[in-house]
Amino acid sequence: MTKSIGCDIIKVTRFNSFLQNRKKLERFFTQREIENSAMKGKGVLESLAGKFSAKESLIKALSPLINIKIKYSLKDIEIISLPKGNIIFQLHNDIKTLINQMNLKLYLTISHEREYAIAFVIVEN
């Protein structure tokens, strides 16, 4: 049963500054996400924007379901690309514990087209 949804759209050019500022990049993305995005060649900005949008989408989807304050950073929400091309969440720390305690299933899709990246999350139990 669907419990909640979340959606986020972001302008890809917002991530130009991330490529020049490693600290900024590492504040929002795990090392694995950075390495995966770098392998995209010319699509590195789209990849980063899509991952960021996915993280924001998950927060939006979870916010109506959570009535307690939890401590998290966007690096606790990791976006993993699987060999077949699909993507999944790899959660860490308190947010992982919360999802497991609530017995939630997460579904994610990301799309990007030149100027924009969008992500959509479905939360089910």
Swiss-Prot record:
GO cellular component terms, A-Z: cytoplasm
Enzyme class (EC, first level): transferase
Main location: cytoplasm
GO molecular function terms listed in the Swiss-Prot or TrEMBL record: holo-[acyl-carrier-protein] synthase activity; magnesium ion binding
Binding residues annotated for Mg(2+), in chain numbering: D8, E56
One matching Pfam family: ACPS
Residue ranges of coiled coil: none
Stated role: Transfers the 4'-phosphopantetheine moiety from coenzyme A to a Ser of acyl-carrier-protein.
Protein family according to the UniProt entry: Belongs to the P-Pant transferase superfamily. AcpS family.
Name of the protein in its database record: Holo-[acyl-carrier-protein] synthase
Organism: Borrelia turicatae (strain 91E135)
